[in-house]
């Protein structure tokens, strides 16, 4: 490995996985900013929370994720009593899937209680106005920011807890999906590669940073193409690029 290390990219091969990755990114930002240890972390927290609520309003994430978890459960059940398969580990995974699926299905629509929160609703209406978090635009926010830190942190963690069943279910589905494939060495001749596969959800790439390139990817569940671009010129890279790829 080179001194600069590797850069990792993921690309969804269907719309559901695209939404799941966006939600995962927002959940990660919420988790990193919820303790409000830095002066402007509240901006990261609220912008991530409101983007999350917009996604949950537009997409039936609970129903889609429930179906995908059930599909995973059937796939794993097919391995039961197969010689050479660690049955203890398999049963553990099946129990995890059943538990997060049950918790997800028993909750109301994710984000519904947050949408009904009067403080959050008033804040969301004006939060994305450029520079709109001034005290004259959002006096309620200005008041909230002057509350004791422990009070504000209780608020942020309580709001996050409303998304816990979604977070647990999504994290498990993405983890198991990522674990379906190992990275294998690849070479993109003249910076280009295309391939076919069967019913895949996700591409994962590791690229040496000192190659000075980033990938532009298009694809769906049965075919993909990627073109490496030069970061310096923002044009097609014409050299061979070595990288590793996992098709999940």
Curated annotation (Swiss-Prot):
Q: Is Cell division among this UniProt entry's keywords?
A: yes
**Recorded superkingdom:** Bacteria
Which InterPro entries has this protein been placed in?
A: ZapD (IPR009777), ZapD_C (IPR027462), ZapD_sf (IPR036268)
Q: Give yes or no: UniProt keyword Cell division.
A: yes
Gene3D superfamilies the UniProt entry points to: YacF-like, YacF-like domains
- Gene Ontology, cellular component aspect: cell division site; cytoplasm
Which keywords, in A-to-Z order, does the entry hold?
Answer: Cell cycle, Cell division, Cytoplasm, Septation
Q: Where in the cell is it found?
A: Cytoplasm
| GO term, biological process aspect, one | FtsZ-dependent cytokinesis
- Describe the function of this protein: Cell division factor that enhances FtsZ-ring assembly. Directly interacts with FtsZ and promotes bundling of FtsZ protofilaments, with a reduction in FtsZ GTPase activity.
Q: Which NCBIfam families is this protein grouped with?
A: PRK05287.1-3 (NF003655)
Q: Which family does it belong to?
A: Belongs to the ZapD family.
Q: How does it assemble?
A: Interacts with FtsZ.
- By what name is this protein known? Cell division protein ZapD
Question: Which organism's genome codes for this protein?
Answer: Aliivibrio salmonicida (strain LFI1238)
Which gene specifies this protein's sequence?
A: zapD
